Amino acid sequence: MTEMTSNEMRGYATSQSLPATILLVEDEPAVRHVTREALEMGGYRVLAADGPDAATHIARDESNAIDLLLTDVVMPGMNGPELARPVRELRPELVTLFMTGYADAEVLRLAMLEGPHKHIQKPFTVHSLLARVADALAARWNDRDRKQAPQYPSP
């Protein structure tokens, strides 16, 4: 990831999105640590899990607080699209951002079948991570606002 100052990160996230809680699922400790730091410096609340089992427990406990699922695609035991299914059952409007180091079209195709999602290719920069997170959250909030807007009859 490229360098951004703390003020740049905080400024970017607050100018691009509302405060949000992100469930981060990454089995590689170094990647999880750096990604968590970048997101927190960007102004987000981060719930971090080292794999699908821990993520499922966090999702059950915090389902009403989670705004975005940010998960690795390839993990031992269960892949990202498989993890997204039970998390989305708890929070159907959840948008998922998949992180992948592979250009595996089949995994991403399966992810598309699971519901609304976006993906980001590893390695990514802090700027591109924050931009993708902000875009995913904006899309979710815009969709939610559209569904909650009053419906007026046609003349």
What role is predicted for each listed range?
Residues Y102-E106:
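Negatively charged, flexible loop motifs adjacent to catalytic sites
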